[in-house]
């Protein structure tokens, strides 16, 4: 689809690709609309496994990669409000179930990855910018306090939504405000207080997409900032299975406990189910050893939860987002 000329998506017409595989449903539009024009790329039956770290799971009924903010909001305004919408970043903290994801998956591209320095300690960052890019930009600008983002394998949109954190800091420590594209097609600017942050949670509604965030740090020396970022990178390399098909941290830390320690004490280090395995290097990470299905991975996680509860009476809560339908 051309990125220059708007192309109508009509509910009564099925793209040719829909005849292959299971087929996507016709895209449902808002009452009174006969089509919705997009300038980005919209793909039916889009495989999601290549886009997520586990390399498993089904397809998106529709994958929409908007050209820019106006393209995204125009699409939302034309879409039936009952059609589910989900944002996808780097796919690092997600299990896509084997039956695929109904509705629309929105993936923000380069147009949403821009970063602008507002003043000596403040950056405006697009929702598609990675944690590595944000922290590196802050380092080069002499802005301290954002180093921990080097340890979050995701995008601004994702870690703002979930109050992502690493190495003792969280997004709520640096966020000034976020711009959120709501399912209605309107865009709102939310100050920090409105996000209602708690541990790995925010009040961003389902179907909304975080398209921009403003972060504030403090004056710092680029060399010292870089040294801290390097230390974070080394610590991750030494303690986490980074070069594997993994989804990152699997379970939230219960109050007063480390999830990995509970998992280890329950005898789950190295536990396998099919080609899914609890990492021996860091047992709060699950691995796809090659041919694991998302069903294998999720079932292994549930077995870990069962064993931890049986031995400690503590219920681990999933940190990884699990989306879509079982096959």
What are these regions (language model features)?
Residues 81, 88-90, 174, 244-245, ...:
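Short, basic and Ser/Thr-rich N-terminal targeting/leader segments
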């Amino acid at each position: 689809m051309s990125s220059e000329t708007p192309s109508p998506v009509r509910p009564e017409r099925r793209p040719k690709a829909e005849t292959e595989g299971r087929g996507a449903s016709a895209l449902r539009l808002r009452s009174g609309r006969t089509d919705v024009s997009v300038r980005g790329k919209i793909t039916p039956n889009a495989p999601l496994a290549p886009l997520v770290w586990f390399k498993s799971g089904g397809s998106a009924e529709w994958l929409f990669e908007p050209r820019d903010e106006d393209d995204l909001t125009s699409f939302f305004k034309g879409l039936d409000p009952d059609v589910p919408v989900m944002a996808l970043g780097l796919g690092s903290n997600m299990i896509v179930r084997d039956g695929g994801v109904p509705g629309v998956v929105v993936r923000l591209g380069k147009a949403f990855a821009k970063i602008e320095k507002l003043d000596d300690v403040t950056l405006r960052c697009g929702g598609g910018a990675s944690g590595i890019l944000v922290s590196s930009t802050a380092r080069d600008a002499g802005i301290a306090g954002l180093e921990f983002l080097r340890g979050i394998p995701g995008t601004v949109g994702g870690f703002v939504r979930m109050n992502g954190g690493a190495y003792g800091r969280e997004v709520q420590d640096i966020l000034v405000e976020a711009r959120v594209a709501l399912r209605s097609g309107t865009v709102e600017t939310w100050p920090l207080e409105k996000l209602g942050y708690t541990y790995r949670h925010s009040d961003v509604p389902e179907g909304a997409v975080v398209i921009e965030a403003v972060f504030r740090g403090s004056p710092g020396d680029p060399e010292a900032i870089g040294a801290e970022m390097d230390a974070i990178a080394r610590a991750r390399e030494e303690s986490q299975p980074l070069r594997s098909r993994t989804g990152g941290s699997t379970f939230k830390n219960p109050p007063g406990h480390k999830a990995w320690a509970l998992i280890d004490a329950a005898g789950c280090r190295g536990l396998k189910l099919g080609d899914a395995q609890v990492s021996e290097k860091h047992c709060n990470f699950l691995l796809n050893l090659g041919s694991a299905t998302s069903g294998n991975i999720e079932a292994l996680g549930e077995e870990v939860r069962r064993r931890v509860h049986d031995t400690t009476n503590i219920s681990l809560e999933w940190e990884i987002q699990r989306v879509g339908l079982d096959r």
